[in-house]
């Protein structure tokens, strides 16, 4: 298993975000920039950020959060999927009890 990456106040969010990459650099190719399980503790967030040259999708594994997509905010839960296209912005905040866990996939446009 690859070493987790811990980011503080990621993209201007609050608290810490832990990424657990699932693919090594050798396993990734020109079609995948990142594939990771992400954990955001209760009350923490991943700040709103814009994607340039790539797109990102989240599949929520556990928890409840507020997902912001181009200025509109939605509540998402385990089993939901989000998508942020190239040129658009998104972010999320863990508003539930316990950790928010999701799979994140970034692909080039």
Mark where each language-model region is.
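A short, N-terminal "cap"/entry segment at the start of jelly-roll beta-barrel domains
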Residues: 1-33, 47
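Conserved short histidine dyad/triad with adjacent acidic residue
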Residues: 21-24, 36-51, 86
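Short, conserved beta-strand element in jelly-roll/cupin
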Residues: 37-41, 50-67
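A short hydrophobic beta-strand segment most commonly corresponding to one strand
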Residues: 38, 83, 97-109
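A generic "binding-loop/recognition-motif" signal
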Residues: 42-44, 53, 72, 88, ...
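Short beta-strand His + acidic residue motifs that chelate non-heme Fe in jelly-roll/DSBH
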Residues: 48, 67-68, 84, 90-97
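Cofactor-binding loop segments of dinucleotide-utilizing enzymes, especially the Rossmann-like FAD-
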Residues: 62, 70, 107
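Short acidic-glycine-tyrosine-enriched beta hairpin
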Residues: 71-86
